[in-house]
Amino acid sequence: MDYQNIFNQDFYPTPENVIADMLKMSDIQGKIILEPSAGVGNIVDYLQKAGAKEVIACEINDKFRAVLSGKCEIVGDDFLSMAKERISHIDMIVMNPPFSMAKDHILHAWEIAPDGCEIISLSVIICNNIQS
């Protein structure tokens, strides 16, 4: 797959060592986990290898959804329109959201996560003025 044009649209596959760092304080064994902006499935692959009971995903890009369809159940395309009821059975949300929409993805995850659900997100914080 040619990722060249897609990288300009906030796609960046998460390296395995970064995923390992994201999850080093969490127990994913036997958990049902949502990856809401799954891309080509790097996080999905890692979670499955590490012992998750089930991994489900959302992905808005048609080409990426085609890649993911052989890896896990795809429960939606646009995560930001995902209803709370659709994921009421999950234990965790693990994500590396698009930089340009990271805040929206994190806040939406917080709004729809079932009680007791752990949310783990990779994100970049850019400070324009540290004093403010």
Q: Model-predicted segments: where are they?
A:
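Class I S-adenosyl-L-methionine-dependent methyltransferase catalytic core
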Residues: M1-S132
